[in-house]
């Protein structure tokens, strides 16, 4: 390994050694010896030793069933520990500058000064900075909350061990603690035994807020404030809220029958309870800190004659929080209380605390004001009284079904059979009407009642409790108007952001005309108060058309929507539904944001962060601060130094590449008669459905083929066997055809000068690096019937051909040569992933031999799936 990663290497080997000791103590020498043999053979096989490769396959074939789980768990744990060491390395004092831009904002300010961007414009852009991260449950977030807490503690130990002035006694104590944590992880269940409920998923999200984001937000704002102050001469306003959070956990009912209006209500109560609980800790700390006696008149008026005025103000806040917690607790435990929790708005906390803050500054105690008190004020702005705002997501057909059932009941026809024009006419008339639409004697079907009950829950809460109402599979203007009407009928007293999600290739191409149509309805313009949110779906478009065509459709849709927004004079927020993987839009955030169309980040950034990516990007306070810095610097750069408008010849070539790649992708996925049976045999797709991973079923339609599979299991399955097909199929082929037609020079120019195109190629390189032709081939040999194998050979040959094509256009010798850290990080994990792949192929072979496989085989299989997911990083 490269000498410059010596600190990381030594942490990985120390954690590996401690894990080895744990395995030996728990499972004996035999298992440890097996693990070591497999690790060494795998390393040698990776280096190209064919004889050792054969030995490795035999070694795994000969493992008795009862040894499979401990061996699989060993490699799974190695990977988790490697991930921890790597994540820690990015925030450690030994971290190299190319690994992590430690001062992204500072570098940006230097660039702005060099390009003579006015300080006035910079100040304006900082004031408008708006990053909203939307936490979503991930059906494949395999790490349990129990494990996540242990990972945080392991990180703390690594941090302690890095201190050079640690006494031998302290060092020994920390190493001992590390050993205990690794042993605790080894003896805990890596995998959930039951599917998590939507409530479990929401609690997982709250754990991330409590363990990381709660600490990261004030820290990030403190750093940003200092940098802004030194560059512009004045810091951030005290009520700045550049970063805040929403969540889909407990609100996303699209295809998830387990998320009901009762669950949503419970999650809303739980998030308020958790917020009050966290503020109570803050207030208790402030009560002990703010013992000062000197204050200004405003605080004196609030505190009366009390000797310690600040404490006099804080104590009633403490009581308010305690009472809120008690009432919410009772409601969560099913008690029917008529009384409301006293803490209703953020101002109840903000106003008295801000008065204390001003008083401390006026009385010469600014240094005290700018400590814990300022942190709490920053949190109040970022988290409010709801901690995270809840998005509600539902599929468009469910809203149409409500109105259709209603119009049939009223005897005015079937809404679902009407033309789009008639639907719009009906909806706008009703939105304009003062009389209620829902008759009292109407008994809706249970499905329809559920949608109406959800709208009532929204209407009963304050506006701050919710983010957006997202309509999945949105196709028409009536899809958006229908939701506004249902919310109005439920008596919703505020305007909620109703956000259409355009997710297939056709829907992305039609997004502009749908929004334009809405903007031409005067009533609608008044309704939305000049603000429209639109969500761009990454996963379904890539599944539908392949990454190259989907990426270009997303770009063009964003560009067109920005134009519609400008023409209509409305503020547009684009909401990005990215996943962790390339096939679902996941790219290194900084590069991805800078490759978006000019002006597309003017309304700020709203982006989903999913399960396992939440853990990698936001799971530790220091890592979260880095992520916020990266997002902030990318948005500021995109808005202050916008990327060039693409040249017409770039666009024309992109149109061609998009069409060719889409056809090449669909020719295989839809047109190849052997494709579905091959996919089912070569990947663990069928087995994945049985795993207790997320609360949501893996298919929208339980009987359908590939098209009915959700985008996440579709990509997840392919990343398990290391072919990662959806993330590259079609792209290289299209580029090769363009080269054959004489476009090599133009492609090279696009690669050099157009961030959109160079980012696409960079993402492909990362996927190619994670693919393994030899592993994918091994799955075929072990699992696929001989008549289907030629398809696998064809796909692997295409992959190898595509890699050469992309390197040729980039004028590169090797994959990821411009990203040595990314390359190293993948290399480091591959050492442990490959044995897991070999084990998984063997386990799939054994479980498919019988109708009722032994439970120990299924458990071992789940461990390999979890391990490979942890190793591949962006699982789905």
Curated annotation (Swiss-Prot):
The keyword Lyase applies. One of its GO terms (biological process) is carbon fixation. Its EC number is 4.1.1.31. One of its GO terms (cellular component) is cytosol. Keywords: Carbon dioxide fixation, Lyase, Magnesium. PROSITE patterns: PEPCASE_1 (PS00781), PEPCASE_2 (PS00393). Its cofactor is Mg(2+). Belongs to the PEPCase type 1 family. This is Phosphoenolpyruvate carboxylase. It comes from Vibrio cholerae serotype O1 (strain ATCC 39315 / El Tor Inaba N16961). The lineage of its organism: Bacteria, Pseudomonadati, Pseudomonadota, Gammaproteobacteria, Vibrionales.
